[in-house]
Each structure stands twice: as structure tokens, then as C-alpha cells.
Amino acid sequence: MSKVTFKITLTSDPRLPYKVLCVPENTPFTAVLKFAAEEFKVPAATSAIITNDGIGLNPAQTAGNVFLKHGSELRLIPRDRVGSC
């Protein structure tokens, strides 16, 4: 089974920390999003992953498809403060 590697950067932190994740290519991307959010200690339910160009990703696909379409460098955006007063 082939694996794909993602470098996921946390955009909400000014230091821009990142994690490198290596997962089987048939892994649901929702699992990658959930794991990355847990690693950064942000809520997965209110987080999104985008490309470096700012394009949002639909998590309802495999990690292999995301890798082929968008490459390995992605950004995690916690949306916990969006719309709050």
C-alpha cells in the first residue's frame, strides 16, 4: 500500500508551526483533518484545510486524491473565532 506525505501548517499561530503526516493513500481525508487538528490541539469539527493558494478542500475524498490534486503542502484553519463577537 502506497503512502502520501502532507506538510500541514497551522495558520492561526503567528509562528506558523507545522506537522508532517504520512498516511496510506486510501485514508479518508476527514481522518487526516481530524488527526491534524488534534495534533495542533484545535477543534476538528470547526477546522478546515486549504491549499497554500487559499483553495478550500472537500474532505470527502481520499488522502491520495488530495495529494494528486493539490500537492503535499496544506494549511489548517481553525474556525473557532469566525463570526463570534
From Swiss-Prot:
Cross-link Glycyl lysine isopeptide (Lys-Gly) (interchain with G-Cter in UFM1) placement: 69
Record bears the keyword Nucleus: yes
SUPFAM superfamilies linked to this entry: Ubiquitin-like
CDD domains, per database record: Ubl_UFM1
GO cellular component labels: cytoplasm; nucleus
Cross-link (Glycyl lysine isopeptide (Gly-Lys) (interchain with K-? in acceptor proteins)): 83
Cellular localisation: Nucleus; Cytoplasm
UniProt family annotation: Belongs to the UFM1 family.
Subunit text: Interacts with uba5. Interacts with ufc1.
Listed name of the protein: Ubiquitin-fold modifier 1
Source taxonomy: Eukaryota, Metazoa, Chordata, Craniata, Vertebrata
